[in-house]
């Protein structure tokens, strides 16, 4: 920061579950930052691998570990971590999954931006841009089945083609940073999502509260695993994908037709299930729409 102004304090929140070796590599990346965070809050979601041994072997004084008694999912882990960061009084809260590694200057680049909501830009291990945060998340038009219609990766193709900052309409909790005032205003991430769309929900709430979100081109975050967004919609993850997608539409659809879209999607899935190889997906979508209706109202998430 220029003019002798002390920099804002930073709490990193890392949520991990059964990926000890990736977590160790990620913590090495945090230790190599040219500007160190003030604290790293690791939420261990009741891992059953050697995560506890990896964490016990770390010697960084800024590392604090909270182990949950059960797996809260990514959503529950981030809700807990953000609560801890907020209660600790740190100025900025930087959210990380356990499979990303920041470039050494990543935190410096983010702290140079005087904005309330920021996103580091992800690339794969070969340096290819793979930032899937949405530049357009359409909750206005009912005929748009998948609301994420544009993203950084498809808009620009390469990091070099990006402007210095790109405005986003949703984020991923892999490199997202916000000031504590954002949490004070809109509350915590919603743990009821368990997995998927908790970051989308938080971004929608932030934007509707008047906060703008910026992806920062030169803040580099390296993803250690390939993206796998083609989940088995007939499996347990498929249930959460449908339920949480429907919940976002029920909560935030900008008109009645968009809020009704989940019913149409569910009907189509059920009707087509005999042609798609079985009825497991149909059972998932029927369960999902009932559960999503129960999520229409945002639960109490205030930090007060």
Say what each PLM segment does.
Residues 24, 49-57, 105:
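Acidic helix N-cap motif at the loop->helix transition within catalytic regions
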Residues 28-37:
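Short, acidic, metal-binding catalytic loop of nucleotide-sugar glycosyltransferases
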Residues 29, 44-53, 70, 100:
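A conserved acidic beta->alpha catalytic loop
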Residues 68-88:
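Glycine-rich, basic loop-to-helix element that forms the pyrophosphate-binding segment
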Residues 90-99:
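Short beta-strand-to-loop acidic/aromatic patch adjacent to the donor-nucleotide binding site
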Residues 105-138:
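Conserved donor NDP-sugar-binding/catalytic core segment of glycosyltransferases
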Residues 170-171, 175-188, 192-219:
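A short, conserved alpha-helix in the catalytic core of glycosyltransferases
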Residues 236-244, 254-304:
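Non-catalytic, C-terminal membrane-associated alpha-helical segments of glycosyltransferases
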């Amino acid at each position: 920061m220029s003019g002798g102004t002390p920099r804002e304090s930073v709490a990193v929140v890392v949520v991990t579950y059964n990926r000890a070796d990736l977590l160790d590599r990620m913590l090495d990346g945090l230790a190599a930052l040219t500007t160190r965070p003030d604290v790293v809050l690791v939420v261990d979601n009741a891992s059953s691998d050697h995560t506890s041994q990896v964490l016990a072997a770390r010697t960084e004084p800024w590392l604090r570990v909270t182990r949950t008694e059960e797996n809260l999912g990514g959503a529950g882990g981030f809700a807990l971590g953000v609560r801890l960061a907020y209660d600790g009084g740190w100025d900025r809260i930087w959210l990380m999954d356990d499979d990303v590694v920041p470039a050494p200057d990543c935190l410096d680049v983010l702290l140079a931006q005087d904005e309330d909501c920021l996103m580091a830009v992800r690339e794969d291990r070969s340096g290819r841009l793979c930032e899937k945060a949405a530049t357009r998340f359409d909750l206005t038009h009912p005929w748009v089945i998948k609301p994420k219609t544009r993203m950084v990766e498809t808009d620009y193709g390469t990091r070099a083609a990006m402007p210095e900052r790109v405005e986003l309409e949703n984020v991923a909790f892999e490199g997202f940073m916000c000031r504590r005032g954002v949490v004070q205003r809109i509350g915590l991430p919603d743990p009821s999502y368990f997995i998927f769309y908790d970051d989308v929900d938080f971004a929608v709430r932030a934007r509707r509260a008047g906060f703008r979100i910026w992806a920062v081109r030169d803040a580099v975050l390296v993803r250690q695993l390939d993206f796998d967004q083609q989940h088995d919609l007939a499996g347990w993850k498929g249930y959460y994908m449908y339920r949480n997608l429907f919940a976002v539409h029920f909560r935030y659809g900008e008109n009645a037709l968009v809020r009704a879209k989940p019913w149409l999607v569910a009907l189509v899935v059920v009707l087509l299930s005999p042609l798609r190889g079985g009825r497991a997906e149909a059972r998932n979508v029927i369960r999902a729409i009932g559960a999503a209706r129960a999520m229409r109202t945002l639960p109490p998430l205030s930090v007060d």
